[in-house]
Design a protein with these regions (language model features):
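Glycine-centered flexibility sites
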Residues: 96, 102, 119, 133, ...
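Conserved segment of the helicase C-terminal RecA-like domain
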Residues: 140, 146-190
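SF2 helicase motor core recognition
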Residues: 109-114, 124-141, 164-173
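A short acidic (Asp/Glu
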Residues: 54-58, 134-138, 153, 188-189
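Conserved nucleotide-binding/hydrolysis micro-motifs of P-loop NTPases
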Residues: 49-53, 105, 130-132, 147-149, ...
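Post-DEXD/H (motif II) to motif III coupling segment of the RecA-like Helicase ATP-binding lobe
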Residues: 1-3
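Conserved C-terminal RecA-like helicase domain
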Residues: 13-16, 20-125, 148-160
C-alpha cells in the first residue's frame, strides 16, 4: 500500500531517437543518483526492455559511484563461474546493484528480489516485471523510460502501478518518484 509519494519531473527532449533522448535521461540519472547513494536508499529504476536494463545498469556500474559492498561476493563468484567471467551483472552485484527482467533464470530473479528486499542490493534496474507479481518496494522509483515496450507509451494505469512501488506502508512512509519525461494523462472511462 502506497502511503505518499513526492513526484519530481526531469526534462527529456520530445523529438529524436533513444540515443538522443538518452543524453537527457543519463544527465538526469547522474544528477540524482549521487544523493540517493549517499543516503543509502533503496531505489528501483524502470526501463522498457531487458537490453535497456543491462545498458543502464552498466552505465551506473561504470560511473564509479558505487563502492564495493563485500556482501554478495559469493554470489558474484558463482555467477562468474557458472555463466561467464565477464558478466556485468556478476560484477554489479558486488556493488549492491542488479537488474531484473523476464529473461533471467527464475531462481536468479527470485534471489535478486530477495537480496533487494533484505537491502543487500540497493539499486535494482528492471522492466515491467516489477508490476507482474514481484513483491518489493523502494524509497525511490526512477522512471527512466516513458514506454512499456518499444515506443508504446506508458498509460496512466501502468504508470501508477510502477510509481506505486515507492513509499510503501510500514517501510517507507514517503516515497520519491523521479520521472524522466512527462506523466501520462489519465484516461477517463467516459
Amino acid at each position: 500500500k502506497t502511503v505518499s509519494s513526492n513526484e519530481e519531473y526531469f526534462r527529456v527532449r520530445e523529438n529524436g531517437n533513444d540515443i538522443d533522448k538518452d543524453i537527457d535521461r543519463d544527465r538526469n540519472l547522474f544528477e540524482i543518483l549521487p544523493q540517493i547513494i549517499e543516503r543509502r536508499e533503496q531505489t528501483v529504476i524502470f526501463c522498457k526492455s531487458p537490453q535497456r536494463v543491462a545498458i543502464v545498469m552498466a552505465k551506473i556500474l561504470e560511473s564509479g559511484l558505487l563502492d564495493l559492498m563485500n556482501v554478495n561476493s559469493e554470489l558474484s563468484l558463482w555467477l562468474k563461474n557458472t555463466y561467464h567471467d565477464d558478466w556485468t551483472l556478476a560484477s554489479a552485484i558486488e556493488h549492491g546493484l542488479a537488474y531484473h527482467h523476464g529473461k533471467l533464470p527464475r531462481a536468479l530473479s527470485s534471489l535478486i528480489v530477495e537480496l533487494f528486499n533484505k537491502e543487500e542490493l540497493k539499486i535494482l534496474v528492471c522492466t515491467s516485471t516489477l508490476i507482474e507479481g514481484v513483491n518489493t518496494s523502494a524509497k525511490n522509483m526512477i522512471i527512466y523510460d516513458d514506454c512499456i515496450t518499444g515506443r508504446e507509451k506508458l498509460d496512466a494505469f501502468t504508470f501508477n502501478n510502477i510509481s506505486g512501488r515507492s513509499g510503501r506502508m510500514f517501510k517507507y512512509f514517503v516515497g520519491n518518484v523521479f520521472i524522466f519525461g512527462q506523466r501520462p494523462e489519465p484516461q477517463l472511462p467516459f
